[in-house]
Amino acid sequence: MFGKGGLGGLMKQAQQMQERMQKMQEEIAQLEVTGESGAGLVKVTINGAHNCRRIEIDPSLMEDDKEMVEDLVAAAFNDAVRRAEEMQKEKMASVTAGMQLPPGMKFPF
């Protein structure tokens, strides 16, 4: 069922991948991603753990109404989260690449 390496080989691969995934998650948490809204007038930078690091608001928006600025900040934050999640998927795909899984089995389980 598991081929030449047997179950022991699969378990060893899984352990190695778990170690690589943990290391990758630690690296991802340190990376920063910036989301934008209003054609770059509002920028929100978050880390890989989705913690907000910085918010930049173009001074020209300070004269506009408060509700619009709040909406732009929320949109920029959501854009940053989306970008962070895409980055995480790409990084984690590199960790699982090359691992031989039984047919139909996918990571994460």
Curated annotation (Swiss-Prot):
Q: From start to end residue, where is composition biased (Low complexity)?
A: 10-19
Name a GO CC annotation attached to this entry: bacterial nucleoid
Subcellular localization(s) per the UniProt record = Cytoplasm, Nucleoid
Q: Which UniProt keywords apply?
A: Cytoplasm, DNA-binding
Report whether Cytoplasm shows up as a keyword of the record.
yes
GO molecular-function terms, A-Z: DNA binding
Please state the protein's primary subcellular location: cytoplasm
The region called Disordered is annotated at 1-21
In its keyword annotation, does this UniProt entry include DNA-binding? yes
> Which InterPro entries does this entry report, sorted A to Z?
YbaB-like_sf (IPR036894), YbaB/EbfC (IPR004401)
Which NCBIfam families would you find in this protein's record? DNA_YbaB_EbfC (TIGR00103)
- Subunit structure, interactors included: Homodimer.
Checking PANTHER family in the record gives: NUCLEOID-ASSOCIATED PROTEIN YBAB
Question: What is the role of the protein in this entry?
Answer: Binds to DNA and alters its conformation. May be involved in regulation of gene expression, nucleoid organization and DNA protection.
**Similarity-based family:** Belongs to the YbaB/EbfC family.
Q: What protein name does the entry list?
A: Nucleoid-associated protein APL_0075
Query: What species was this sequence derived from?
Result: Actinobacillus pleuropneumoniae serotype 5b (strain L20)
